[in-house]
Amino acid sequence: MTTPFQTRRDFLKTSALAAASLPFVGALAARAQTAAPGRKLGFALAGLGSLSTNQIAPAFKKTNFCQLAGIITGTPAKAATWKAKYNIPDKNIYNYDTMEKMADNPDIDVVYVVTPNGLHADHTIKAAKAGKHVLCEKPMEVSPEKCQQMIDACKAANRMLAVGYRLHFDPNHLECIRLAREKVFGNLNMIQAEYGFRIGQKQWRLDRALSGGGPLMDVGIYALQAARYISGEEPALVSATQVNNDPVKFKDMEESLTWQLKFPGGVIANCSTTYNFSGFDRLRAFADRGWFELAPAYGYGGIQGKRSDGKWTPIAGIDQFAAEMDDFAQCIMENRPTKVPGEEGLRDLKIMMAIYEAAKTGKTVSLT
């Protein structure tokens, strides 16, 4: 690799150029490779931080349809480490300046974008231009406009785009959805969803240019997602309150946030998130004749369920990342839609912007 590495922060400066180059996607898309029958799809990880290192890369060993084929990083030392650990050939190692060269690499079918939130559009657009399908970590981006750019880029390239909503594949969450849809306890009335932790001082998540916001964009999105898929509806109204007890550490973002969603069918969801304390990890739904809950609810493992009639059957955990990658690979190979498309990420961003507006103004915001 002779091309100089480009850092994530440097990449922020070139986002406009990436969006402007969309008209040239078509020609490159025509060269995109589709996986041959019987082989696993090759994934390239863009961004080699803690999530990729500790969760996603190990998950490949548990997949049936995926393999780690390449990496994209702005840090040469990481490239060397990953090359040695995962036996990645030099031709499958890229930096953020050379992503377009993936267009000529049939080893790579999918780019899994795991960079900071504010870089997702840049890296997704580059991957789509290279003719690759994209799985992008949540939140999809930092604004609805950026999300739409990502959707448009992948559509123009005729490539699939999915958002890394791992809990859509977790059996405990799927059981809660079943209990709600089948009205096991009658009609749903209220949802409580909360998730947060105490964040350290030196985190890219405290840089608003990269994160787009505070805990809402990071872990609060899980509570928002849960409210949406448990209710089975899209919220109509939102109100919110923001708390900042440490204005130095959280100088340009929320420290803690609570919000209420009102759904068309009458369900109310009370949600909370924080960056100031831990032990905040629960989902509970109340219906006419009982309730069901997950506590802890949103982690990579150890999710525990309970229901008011005592009939919750323990469900063995899975590797959520392996499940989401396998599902996306199958969607690509079978040419069927993913249940977590870019439009799902766009909906979350629109709601989160409304939550921020409600917290800032103190007024109820309409989402219809």
Language model segments and positions:
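N-terminal secretory signal peptides and thylakoid transit peptides that target proteins
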Residues: 1-19
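C-terminal helical cap and adjacent loop that interface with cofactors, partners, or active-site loops
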Residues: 15-18, 311-368
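N-terminal Rossmann-like dinucleotide-binding module
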Residues: 15-87
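Predominantly a Rossmann-like dinucleotide-binding segment in NAD(P)-dependent oxidoreductases
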Residues: 39, 51-52, 160, 167-251, ...
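Hydrophobic residues in well-ordered beta-strands that form the structural core
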Residues: 45, 95, 136, 161-163, ...
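Conserved SAM-binding strand-loop segment of SAM-dependent methyltransferases
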Residues: 91-97
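Beta-strand-loop-alpha-helix segment that lines the small-molecule cofactor/substrate pocket
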Residues: 109-110, 116-117, 121-168
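NAD(P)-dinucleotide binding in Rossmann-like oxidoreductases
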Residues: 247-254, 262-325, 341
